[in-house]
């Protein structure tokens, strides 16, 4: 059985771990000075840290939308027997809720609430 593992960018796994385990990341939106970026795509953690270290305001994040999740599911559902999505904990973000709503249209998608963030979430992803 061919299974695809998907997580959001907050799982903090290294590029090597992601590649070795064929994990797909969905980047959260990072808001810096009212400007939106995609985590790990159009802004790096180093850029965020440098911004804050220079006295800038803390950045915030926004969950992936239902539509963004649906786009990712559409991309992988045809080629995989199952898709497992492990999200940032539902107590921290709307990622889990949005992924569940998007998954209603994809019977081979299962959404898992990691109940964690950063490396805790990453460990759940690696165990999958």
Task: Show where each model-derived region lies.
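Active-site histidine-anchored catalytic micro-motif
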Residues: 79, 93-128
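N-terminal glycine-rich anion-binding loop in soluble enzyme alpha/beta folds
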Residues: 4-65
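Short active-site oxyanion
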Residues: 1-5, 81
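Short beta-strand segments
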Residues: 7, 87-89, 112-113
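Conserved beta-strand scaffold positions in the cores of enzyme catalytic domains, especially
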Residues: 25, 60, 85, 109-111
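Class I S-adenosyl-L-methionine
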Residues: 19, 74, 100-104
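N-terminal glycine-rich phosphate/adenylate-binding segment common to multiple enzyme folds
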Residues: 68-96
């Amino acid at each position: 059985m061919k299974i695809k593992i998907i997580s959001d960018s907050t799982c903090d796994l290294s590029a090597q771990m992601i590649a070795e385990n064929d994990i797909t990341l969905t980047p959260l939106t990072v808001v810096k000075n009212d400007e939106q970026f995609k985590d790990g795509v159009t802004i790096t953690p180093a850029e965020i840290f440098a911004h804050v270290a220079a006295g800038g305001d803390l950045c915030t994040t926004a969950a992936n939308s239902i539509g963004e999740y649906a786009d990712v599911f559409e991309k992988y559902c045809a080629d995989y027997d199952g898709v497992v999505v492990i999200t940032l904990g539902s107590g921290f973000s709307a990622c889990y809720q949005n992924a569940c709503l998007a998954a209603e249209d994809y019977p081979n998608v299962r959404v898992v609430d990691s109940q964690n963030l950063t490396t805790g979430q990453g460990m759940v992803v690696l165990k999958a």
